[in-house]
Amino acid sequence: MKALIFLGAIIAGVLSDEWSPMDPEEVAFEEAKCMEDHFGNDFGLAEKWMKWNLAESDGKTACYVKCLVEALGMYDKQAFQPNNIKRQYEAYKSDNGVDQAKSDAISNELGKIDAKDGKCESIAKGFIQVNNANKGVLEKIYLLDSSVRDAIYKKNPQIKPKGISIFRFCGKQFYQDGEAAYCNVRKHGFSDDPKFIKHSNCTTRGMRWMKKNGEMDESAILRGLHAVNENGKDDVVKKSLQNCKAKDESKARDYYKCIYDGLGEQLFMKVLDYIEVRSENYSYRLREATSKYDANAMRSKVKALDSEAKC
């Protein structure tokens, strides 16, 4: 069933964190995460980055570019990785509309950049120069061009598209709208029914709480807590993960439950509300109108999604 390979390699359960070509959802997630970490509430700057309008002389932009090229696998181990760029191109060459000779030329140009010092400025300067000389090409190779992205989503329903939350996307795979167990999940965050094992595997990976190799990512869980202005529960999360007795066959569900029990339902659901709303559009935090956490707005939006799910 196609749904079971949601998010490409993520749900397929890749057994290492070695880089592999990324689908448009993965790219969009990493792009937005880097923007959140570096835009410093400069919403005008974030708008420029979304359009790949990258200024060579701007310090924030330089460190954003470093974050982005590392997250997308273009730069690793103190060097640009032309083979990774070529692999990304090959994975979607029937969709990206880029000539292979052009892709190879750009990959090779990036490979020549001397950025061994790992500094933001060294990485960004060369990258921006190559990108500016080949406007729009890397956006197509990395599936950020809207026409390329939309075509891939249309052909690959196993990939979560923009506009649907991670919990609705996973819920539709394993439950029927209005189903009692599903409504229990939506209202309380957990269910003992067998379907929840698969559902939590989907959501936990989609939230990036679980890595491709099956390990839990403590930093991703804490990121969600901090996003809802809860900064005093880091140790609770750490202890919940350390003390969790998870079984291989239900690993995601078991860790999910350990975190749930550690934080308590109220706080856990507060975090999930935010993640659900943000997951519909990864640029949610980058818009001034929705940049500040508003618990009431989150709850109102999630209630609307509950109604959509007939819960």
UniProtKB/Swiss-Prot annotation:
GO terms for cellular component: extracellular space. Disulfide bonds join 34-67, 63-120, 170-202, 183-311, 244-258. Transmembrane segments: none annotated. The keyword Disulfide bond applies. The keyword Nucleotide-binding applies. It is found in: Secreted. One of its GO terms (molecular function) is ATP binding. GO terms for biological process: sensory perception of smell. ADP binds at residues 146, 149, 153, 160, 281-283. Keywords: Allergen, ATP-binding, Disulfide bond, Hemostasis impairing toxin, Nucleotide-binding, Platelet aggregation inhibiting toxin, Secreted, Signal, Toxin. Residues 1-16 form the signal peptide. It holds the Pfam family PBP_GOBP. Distal lateral and medial lobes of female mosquito salivary gland (at protein level). Expressed in the head and thorax of the female mosquitoes, where the salivary glands are located. Expressed in salivary gland. Not detected in the female mosquito abdomen. Not detected in the male mosquito tissues. InterPro entries: PBP/GOBP, PBP_GOBP_sf. Modulates blood feeding of female mosquitoes on vertebrate species by binding and sequestering different mediators involved in the host response. Binds adenine, adenosine, AMP, ADP and ATP, with the highest affinity to ATP and ADP. Inhibits agonist-induced platelet aggregation and hemostasis. The amount of D7L1 in the salivary glands of 5-day-old Culex quinquefasciatus is approximately 31 ng. During the blood meal, mosquito injects approximately 7 ng of D7L1 into the host. Belongs to the PBP/GOBP family. This is Long form salivary protein D7L1. It comes from Culex quinquefasciatus.
